[in-house]
A protein has these predicted regions:
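Conserved acidic donor-binding segment of nucleotide-sugar-dependent glycosyltransferases
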Residues: 310-322, 329-337
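Acidic donor-binding loop of glycosyltransferase active sites
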Residues: 264-279, 294
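A short, histidine- and acid-enriched strand-loop-helix "catalytic/donor-clamping" loop
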Residues: 49, 97-112, 127
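Donor nucleotide-sugar binding/catalytic pocket of nucleotide-sugar-dependent glycosyltransferases
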Residues: 126-140, 145-164, 168, 173, ...
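Membrane-proximal helix-turn-helix segments that form the acceptor-binding/catalytic region
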Residues: 65-69, 109-128
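A short, well-ordered alpha-helix in the C-terminal region of glycosyltransferases
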Residues: 327, 331, 338-353, 362-365
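Nucleotide-activated donor-binding/catalytic signature segment of Leloir-type glycosyltransferases, i.e.
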Residues: 191, 222, 230-264
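Conserved donor-binding/catalytic core segment of Leloir-type glycosyltransferases
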Residues: 185-202, 207-221
Length: 372
C-alpha cells in the first residue's frame, strides 16, 4: 500500500535537514517510519515560496491530481491547503481515502450556513486523528463529527534524534578542550536552570512574574519575525513584563529544532506556561522534554494527553497562577533527586507511548483499514 503524504511545512526542507542529522522525524508525523509498517510514501512537493491559502489549495490539488505515482490514500498532517481535494472527496469526485490529523476539537458553528457547509466538508474525510481523547470527546458534541471516523493517535518525539544530541553534549563535556575553555556563568553553578521554548499561546506575563519573584534562572526563547512590518506579539509581551536579571531572553528566527534541542538538553527543567486554549498548545515542547528525560512544569491543559502529576513526570499549574508557578519552580529547585526521577519517568513514558515509531505504527494501522 502507498500513501500521498501532505504537510503544511516544506517537506523537502525537512527531509534535507533530517539527512544532515539536524531535524527530528516526528515533525513528519510518522511518515518516515510508515515503510517499516508496510506503507510506502509519496512525498508532496512543497511550493518553493509561501502562497496564499487559496493558491496553496489550488497548488496542492494540482499536485495530487497530476501525481504520476500510484497511491492508495492521502495522509496529511492538517487539512489546511488540502481543502479542494477534501471537497472533491465529499462530492464523490475523488475516490481515494483521506486521513488527516485534526489539531482542535470539531465545534458547531454559530452560523447555520457555515454549519451546513462544515457538515458537507467533513464528509470528505475518511479518518480524523486527534492528539488526545479529550479532543475526541469534545468533538463528539458537534453534529458534524462522525464517531466512526475519529481516532486517537500517540504523536511523540524522534527518540534517536534526542539521544544523539545528549551523546554529543556528553562527548563535548568530557573533551579536554571543553574543560580548558568553558567557564559556566555564575548563576548556573548555584541554581538549576529552567528553559522555555515554543510560541503558541504562551502566557509570558505569568511566567516572567513567577521567575522575577523566585530569582531562579530562566532561559526564555522567543521566536521573532525578521520583517519589521510584521508584529512580534510574544516579544512585545516579554518586553512589557520587564524580565529581571535572572531571566535570559533569547530571540530566534526560523525553524531551529536541532539548535534549540541542544540548549534544552543542557537545562534542568522545561517550563510551558500557556493561555487557556481548546487544543494541545505546548505539546511539541512536552514530547521533546519527555524524550530528553527532563522534568516538566506545564499549564494544566486537559487537551494534552499527559497527566504530569499522576504519571510522576512533572507538575501541572492552573492557568494564570503566578503563585502556583512559584511553588512549582521552588519545588524543582529544592528537590533535585525528585526532579531527576520525574525526568527519568518522563523518558519511560516517551519510550512506551509518545514516540515517532509508535505514532507511525498507529497511523499505518488506520491507513491499512482502506486496503481491502
Amino acid at each position: 500500500m502507498k500513501v500521498y503524504f501532505y504537510h503544511t511545512q516544506n517537506i523537502q526542507y525537512c527531509l534535507r535537514r533530517m539527512a544532515e542529522g539536524e531535524f527530528p522525524s516526528h515533525f513528519l508525523y510518522g511518515a518516515c517510519h510508515l515503510a517499516d509498517n508496510g506503507v510506502d510514501v509519496v512525498y508532496h512537493r512543497s511550493p518553493k515560496h509561501e502562497l496564499s491559502r487559496l493558491k496553496t489549495a489550488l497548488y496542492t490539488a494540482w499536485r495530487v491530481l497530476t501525481c504520476r505515482e500510484r497511491f492508495d490514500a492521502i495522509y496529511a498532517t492538517h487539512y489546511k491547503g488540502l481543502e479542494l481535494v477534501v471537497l472533491l472527496r465529499a462530492l464523490g469526485l475523488f475516490r481515494k481515502p483521506i486521513v488527516v490529523w485534526h489539531h482542535q476539537p470539531i465545534v458547531k458553528s454559530k452560523s447555520r450556513l457555515r454549519e451546513l457547509l462544515g457538515r458537507f466538508f467533513y464528509k470528505g474525510f475518511d479518518r480524523l486523528i486527534f492528539f488526545s481523547q479529550k479532543l475526541v470527546d469534545d468533538s463528539l458534541k458537534a453534529p458534524k463529527a462522525d464517531p466512526r471516523k475519529l481516532v486517537v493517535g500517540h504523536w511523540g518525539a524522534d527518540l534517536a534524534f534526542y539521544d544523539k544530541i545528549k551523546a554529543e553534549l556528553k562527548a563535548e563535556q568530557t573533551s579536554p578542550s571543553h574543560h580548558l575553555t568553558t567557564t559556566p556563568p555564575q548563576h548556573l553553578t548555584t541554581s538549576p536552570s529552567f528553559i522555555a521554548t515554543g510560541k503558541e499561546q504562551r502566557d509570558q506575563p505569568t511566567l516572567i512574574e513567577a521567575f522575577n519573584r523566585t530569582g531562579r534562572h530562566l532561559i526564555l526563547y522567543i521566536g521573532i519575525n525578521p520583517n519589521p512590518n510584521v508584529p512580534n506579539p510574544n516579544l512585545e509581551a516579554v518586553e512589557r513584563c520587564k524580565p529581571a536579571d535572572n531571566i535570559d531572553v533569547v530571540k530566534i528566527c526560523g525553524l531551529l529544532p536541532y539548535e534549540i534541542a541542544r540548549e534544552v538538553a543542557k537545562a534542568d527543567c522545561v517550563v510551558i506556561c500557556c493561555h487557556r486554549t481548546r487544543y494541545t498548545a505546548g505539546l511539541t515542547t512536552v514530547v521533546e522534554a519527555l524524550a530528553l528525560g527532563l522534568p516538566i512544569i506545564c499549564s494544566r491543559n486537559p487537551q494534552i494527553p499527559v497527566d504530569f502529576d499522576r504519571l510522576g513526570c512533572g507538575i501541572s499549574v492552573e492557568y494564570g497562577d503566578v503563585e502556583g508557578w512559584q511553588r512549582a519552580v521552588e519545588y524543582i529547585s529544592t528537590h533535585p533527586e525528585e526532579a531527576r526521577r520525574m525526568g527519568n519517568r518522563g523518558r519511560e513514558i516517551a519510550e512506551q507511548m509518545f514516540n515517532d515509531e509508535r505514532c507511525a505504527k498507529e497511523v499505518a494501522e488506520v491507513i491499512k483499514e482502506f486496503s481491502l
